[in-house]
Amino acid sequence: GHHRPFNDLGYAGVRIMEAHENYNRQHQDIRIEDGIEYGDVISGVNFKYAKKLTAVNAINLASLGWSPKEPKNVKIGGIVEPSTKLKWDISKDKNIIGYKIYWRKTTSPFWENSRLVGKVNNYKLNGIVIDNYLFGVSSISEKGYESVVVFPNDVF
């Protein structure tokens, strides 16, 4: 998708798309075959939906623009232990006032739990077993904006 070049350069990139594509309209040359119209044409554009999508993109871009830099070198520990440990490089950016830990069950598509942990470079989640959850860390700015959540990329 068009978001990949941004991701490849280290920028947050998101792809927003219609999940139920109409292959008579999309990815087709404009033509009529057996009475069926094919191709992307202006009469097939839902302008109310396009307006909403544009607003969502603008809001998300503003949010990303205001957000602080994400935590670097996020690592996870706690293998064969009853608790999970996370650590990361603490930022020298004075705008970052703290960090937030996220975790969710491995079967969940959404973050279910979070904890503000202050301006520290490590945290231990007692009683949270590493095998049962996915984890992430975000940075929080003094104005309350939050970076993208970073998954651990190494173990310790």
Q: Residue spans of the language-model regions?
A:
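Conserved aromatic anchor
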Residues: P82-N95
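Short beta-strand elements bearing conserved aromatic residues within extracellular beta-rich modules
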Residues: G98-I101
